[in-house]
């Protein structure tokens, strides 16, 4: 157990009573320590243990508590002014700090303090929220949003306008997770703690939440909340039992392994589905 976990857990039970005026110095320091460790990647809201993801709920609780202990304040990044409770990640970064971190941030990109960005990542004009973890070699494309506490794997491509849901608004139990080597097509939305398995390809305009049916056309199986590894997914519809209407679903049209994916472009995988 982390040394400050019990303090965070206890404070969360009494969170309604915590304000910037009433928070104890000990609790404030503990919360700020969690945000700092999230920011540098030493802590994560969720970690993979074997084949399963384990959520560190106490870390998520610390993120939520951080909004209780600070007042809004004016922030200035040299171009824009903000009025918020959470600092921007790069507010005091020097050129040397950016070079050491080893990722690229283009004008218009915003990341909040408490998010982690790994080496060889590119942030186009996009938004990365507090508690999020973006792993190595990932592209966060223009107008993509990585929600609070979301976990993005290695070598992921989040295309233009993609939305990866957070846990803060509305409050969710588990973070949304995109595993390594996934491609998420433009304007798609993955939310509500859905897990997209390693090596999957999500086509443009696919929306998946916990209540979305994920239909495997090869097996006829319907599943919820998790896209199996290596899935190629497009948007579709499933008819009602009486045939009077159909409702939206996500359709797994094929499965691909790493070898096939390495030899095949994304466009080719999505053709002829």
UniProtKB/Swiss-Prot annotation:
Its main location: cytoplasm. Substrate binds at residues 104, 141. It comes from the Bacteria. Homotrimer. It comes from Chromobacterium violaceum (strain ATCC 12472 / DSM 30191 / JCM 1249 / CCUG 213 / NBRC 12614 / NCIMB 9131 / NCTC 9757 / MK). InterPro entries: DapD_Trfase_Hexpep_rpt_fam, Hexapep, Hexapep_transf_CS, THP_succinylTrfase_dom1, THP_succinylTrfase_N_sf, Trimer_LpxA-like_sf. One of its GO terms (cellular component) is cytoplasm. Its EC number is 2.3.1.117. Belongs to the transferase hexapeptide repeat family. This is 2,3,4,5-tetrahydropyridine-2,6-dicarboxylate N-succinyltransferase. It catalyses: (S)-2,3,4,5-tetrahydrodipicolinate + succinyl-CoA + H2O = (S)-2-succinylamino-6-oxoheptanedioate + CoA. The gene is dapD. It is found in: Cytoplasm. Coiled coil: none annotated. One of its GO terms (molecular function) is 2,3,4,5-tetrahydropyridine-2,6-dicarboxylate N-succinyltransferase activity. GO terms for biological process: diaminopimelate biosynthetic process; lysine biosynthetic process via diaminopimelate. Keywords: Acyltransferase, Amino-acid biosynthesis, Cytoplasm, Diaminopimelate biosynthesis, Lysine biosynthesis, Repeat, Transferase. Pathway: Amino-acid biosynthesis; L-lysine biosynthesis via DAP pathway; LL-2,6-diaminopimelate from (S)-tetrahydrodipicolinate (succinylase route): step 1/3.
């Amino acid at each position: 157990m982390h040394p400050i976990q019990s303090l965070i857990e206890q404070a969360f039970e009494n969170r309604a009573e915590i304000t910037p005026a009433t928070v104890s110095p000990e609790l404030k320091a503990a919360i700020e320590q969690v945000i700092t460790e999230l920011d540098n990647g030493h802590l994560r809201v969720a970690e993979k243990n074997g084949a399963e993801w384990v959520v560190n709920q106490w870390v998520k609780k610390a993120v939520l508590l951080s909004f209780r202990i600070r007042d809004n304040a004016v922030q200035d990044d040299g171009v824009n002014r903000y009025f918020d409770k959470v600092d921007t990640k790069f507010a005091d970064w020097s050129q040397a700090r950016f070079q050491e971190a080893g990722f690229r941030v283009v004008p218009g990109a915003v990341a909040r303090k408490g998010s982690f960005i790994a080496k060889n990542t590119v942030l186009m004009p996009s938004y990365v929220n507090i508690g999020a973890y973006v792993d190595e070699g990932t592209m966060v494309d223009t107008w993509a949003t990585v929600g609070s506490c979301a976990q993005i794997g290695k070598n992921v491509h989040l295309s233009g306008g993609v939305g990866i849901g957070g846990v803060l608004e509305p409050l969710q139990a588990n973070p949304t997770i995109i595993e390594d080597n996934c491609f998420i097509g433009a304007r798609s939305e993955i939310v509500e703690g859905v897990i997209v398995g390693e090596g999957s390809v999500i086509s443009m305009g696919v929306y998946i939440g916990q209540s979305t049916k994920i239909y495997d056309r090869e097996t006829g199986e319907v599943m919820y909340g998790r896209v199996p590894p290596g899935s190629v997914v497009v948007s579709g519809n499933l008819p009602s039992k009486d045939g009077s209407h159909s409702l939206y679903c996500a359709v797994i049209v094929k499965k691909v392994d790493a070898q096939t994916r390495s030899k095949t472009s994304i466009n080719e995988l999505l053709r002829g589905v």
